[in-house]
Regions:
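Short helix-coil junctions and helix-kink-helix linkers
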Residues: 1-21
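C-terminal helical accessory/scaffold domains
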Residues: 24-37, 41-173
Length: 173
């Protein structure tokens, strides 16, 4: 059988202290990113509107940081670039996808620079994101990936819009 240490109470105290430390660090990070108000003296915290938007739209923490860092007057090209950088929108780039995506990339609203090609998962998401409004027919395996990117982008864009309305600023108003 399993032998438990004689000092199980001490083990529980150490575990509790580690959990408390992790929670405090997480709260400090949320506060630093502007998602909560945290009183470090009392430990009291309250949700900011940004956190409510994040929760409502089910936006991942790292994606929310990207959204909060957007310039209030960012261009659509910048918006596409930044959203495609969000891990929750990225799909795996396969070797067979590159030729098809590079061909479509030439005709996008916001194409790559002439020397740039699709090389990363972020590049693939950037292309797929721009092909959604044009309803471009893709090969079967990429259709599901494009739908995945489109659904995720809708959530993220809804968060961007809610934040713009909340702050009464931004190019989306």
């Amino acid at each position: 059988g399993i032998k438990l240490p004689n000092n199980i109470g001490e083990f529980e105290l150490i575990l509790e202290e580690k959990m408390k430390d992790q929670c405090c660090r997480a709260l400090e990070r949320l506060s630093q990113e502007g998602l909560i108000n945290l009183d470090t003296v009392t430990g009291e915290c309250s949700c900011r509107p940004e956190a409510a938007v994040m929760s409502r739209q089910m936006v991942q923490f790292n994606s929310m940081i990207v959204i909060l860092a957007l310039s209030p007057l960012c261009s659509l090209k910048e918006l596409f670039r930044e959203l495609s950088a969000c891990a929750e929108l990225q799909v795996v780039l396969k070797r067979d996808d590159k030729k098809i995506l590079n061909e479509h990339a030439k005709h996008m609203e916001y194409p790559f620079k002439s020397s740039e090609k699709v090389k990363t998962d972020q590049d693939k998401s950037y292309v797929l994101l721009q092909l959604v409004p044009d309803r471009v027919k893709l090969v079967e395996n990429m259709v599901k990936e494009q739908e995945y990117v489109a659904h995720g982008a809708c959530r993220l864009l809804s968060a961007v819009i809610e934040l713009a309305i909340e702050s009464q600023s931004g190019g989306l108003l």
